[in-house]
Amino acid sequence: MSVEKAPELRVLSFNCWGLRFVSKYRTERLKAVGEKLAKCDYDIVLLQEVWSIYDFQEIRNLVSCNLVYSRFFHSAAMGAGLAMFSKFPIIESSMNKYPLNGRPQAFWRGDWYVGKGVATASLQHPSGRIISLFNTHLHAPYGKGADTYLCHRLSQAWYISKLLRAAVQRGHIVIAAGDFNIQPLSVPHEIITSYGLVNDAWLSVYPDQVEHPPNRFSMNDKELVEIAGTTCDSRLNTWRENISSKDMDDFVAKRLDYVFHSPSTCEAKNAKVVFLERVPKLDCSYSDHFAIETVLSIKLQPIPVQETRVSYSIIDDTLGITYQYMARERLHMRLRIAHLLISIPLIIGVHVAIAWCDPAWLKVIILFFTVMLTIAAVVNGFCIGLLFGRWEFNGLLEFVAELKEQKLLCKQYLVDHPLPFAKS
């Protein structure tokens, strides 16, 4: 009697660094990505930072023989940069924007303007089961100093974990992938794996791995990729920034790209970092990230969902970070509103003073000064301080309210319904 073989899914996630007018050799690199994907036998491909619809169409045309179904997601002013390719029919899809997603005054970052979020799709697998697919790109920390965007990234991790949890509870085959901009076993990582009811595929395949393997400093560049799973800032990547000699042990190489899966419906059989080669003729890496490839085996008989909740310590840590951030942002909001209130009488006074000014050129200078003062007051005081300040603050209040609810549930479950909790 033959034993039925469990079907497998070969999944790829890749941040393609496709920023228009910024990324070098963007068109050539993304075309090379499409050409390489066309030669591979992936079932599902999730791409991030594909900002141009034309780049998406180029890749789609190249891979359409194998990956018949595709979706490009639109969001905000500049687009989400998220794309999906699949062998299986896409029966439903949507773009879910994060409630907290950077600040408009940091226009050079761009996160607020691109409307980052979670691209979701439901795929019809030949077995008749539904694959719930999630593709995302969380807010980057930016810089080596204090991570002022950590609170937003925690909120984003919480938001996607709620979507994942709902899909797992429906019994779907859940796969979430992308550039999460988080370190393994960090607070955002713990939120996703515990409340989202998913496993980190890399840790599923290599359970002994932690954030920094004990023998990390004895590893060469290749081992750091193959064993530690680093996908960003590796010395093997030609786009890595120049670093000083004190970083020779590859301190800055990080594992930021992930594939998460629902352990109740599928099992991670293999995980590896790919797209390590250089683009032919250009002699450069395909992107400033490497890609992560995972092979998942679909369980013929799904097991009951083991419902975990976020631990007390994780909730407390998250609340502490959020309260600290709220205090800072409340101060900034009040200062900006004060700027607006102070500017109003000042603008009126300058307008009155123009009547007593001679010669005419001085009036022009004062009028120009008044215009600039008005623009600064409206943009900084009204738009950023009042409108966005309240927008962000209300988003933070909602985040805190949901965390407090979870804290109460943790206490109630500990008393009445003991459940396995995530490791704190």
UniProtKB/Swiss-Prot annotation:
Membrane topology classification: Multi-pass membrane protein
GO terms for cellular component: cell periphery; endoplasmic reticulum; endoplasmic reticulum membrane; fungal-type vacuole; membrane; plasma membrane
Pfam families assigned to the protein according to its UniProt record, in alphabetical order: Exo_endo_phos (PF03372)
Biological processes per GO annotation: cell wall organization; ceramide biosynthetic process; sphingoid catabolic process; sphingolipid catabolic process
Signal peptide stretch: none
Primary localization: membrane
UniProt keyword annotations, A-Z: Cell membrane, Cell wall biogenesis/degradation, Endoplasmic reticulum, Hydrolase, Lipid metabolism, Magnesium, Membrane, Metal-binding, Sphingolipid metabolism, Transmembrane, Transmembrane helix
Alphabetical list of InterPro entries matching this protein: Endo/exonu/phosph_ase_sf, Endo/exonuclease/phosphatase, Sph/SMPD2-like
Top EC category: hydrolase
EC number(s) per entry: 3.1.4.-
Residue ranges crossing the lipid bilayer per the database entry: 335-357, 364-386
Active site: H289 (proton acceptor)
Pathway annotation: Lipid metabolism; sphingolipid metabolism
Binding site for Mg(2+): E49
Subcellular location: Cell membrane; Endoplasmic reticulum membrane
Annotated GO MF terms: inositol phosphosphingolipid phospholipase activity; mannosyl-inositol phosphorylceramide phospholipase activity; metal ion binding; sphingomyelin phosphodiesterase activity
Site (Important for substrate recognition) location in chain: N181
SUPFAM superfamilies found in the cross-reference section: DNase I-like
Co-factor(s): Mg(2+)
Matching PANTHER family: PHOSPHODIESTERASE, PUTATIVE-RELATED, SPHINGOMYELINASE FAMILY MEMBER
Free-text function comment from the UniProt entry: Inositol phosphosphingolipids phospholipase essential for the coordination of cell wall formation. Responsible for the hydrolysis of the phosphosphingolipids (IPS), inositol phosphorylceramide (IPC), mannosylinositol phosphorylceramide (MIPC), and mannosyldiinositol phosphorylceramide (M(IP)2C).
Family: Belongs to the neutral sphingomyelinase family.
Entry protein name: Inositol phosphosphingolipids phospholipase C
Organism annotation: Schizosaccharomyces pombe (strain 972 / ATCC 24843) (Fission yeast)
Gene: css1
